[in-house]
């Protein structure tokens, strides 16, 4: 009986500790769950020295042991490699050797005190490709990552075989939110940011809101410096994007309130032979919120022989 009581006490203590960890650091707990899911799916977490800094990245290979077609996924502003979690295992299973870096200043990569900007992150992505000895690959970018992917396709076209842009920051447009909105300081400003990112935002518990605001307080300076670069619009690709010659897929959430679908349509118009797919019911976070149609369009495009050329399609959104 005493032994049972001791075991029960230990279990209760562990439950209290686990509950306390989740309450005080829910974002960390969520990250561990995502990383465990990726690990179970055969996705490896790695580090590499690139451009003088330590960068974290995920790597996944086809389960059949084949080399796989190299595919690099580049995340957006304020994001990290984990944001591709809904797509990485499926892309590897489809025959791709997937590399997913955390850009400089984000995720588990180094966060040096430097003047963050779009060109700096492009150089960081190129340094990553050099560090892992990847001469060329299919390259996909989401939001700010789309700018980086498109810029690489223009500046070093031999490095990009096929290009995929998801709700991408490619052309000039009038922002729907203020410059400082990406670094919320209270519940009201966080609610406004979430409402712009997702057409159907979920209500967050108070302890999750507080943890999220603490994270923005710690790392928001990187986002703000990058936003300073973005809002000048001096690095917009309007005058260059028509020079992209790689087969290009453009995927857009039809309800994107951050970068309106009109930007995607204009990008499609400007890139010769590009394929445009809009996903109904999805917003700026389409690859994460609606991974099934986004994955289907991506895999079909990247595996097509000969490469797909031109065309438009609308897909129904399928939320997780």
Language-model features: where?
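Conserved alpha/beta-hydrolase catalytic His-Asp/Glu region
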Residues: 24-29, 184-245
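Acidic catalytic loop of the alpha/beta-hydrolase fold
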Residues: 255-259
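Catalytic active-site module of serine/aspartate enzymes centered on a nucleophile-bearing elbow/loop
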Residues: 274-275, 281-320
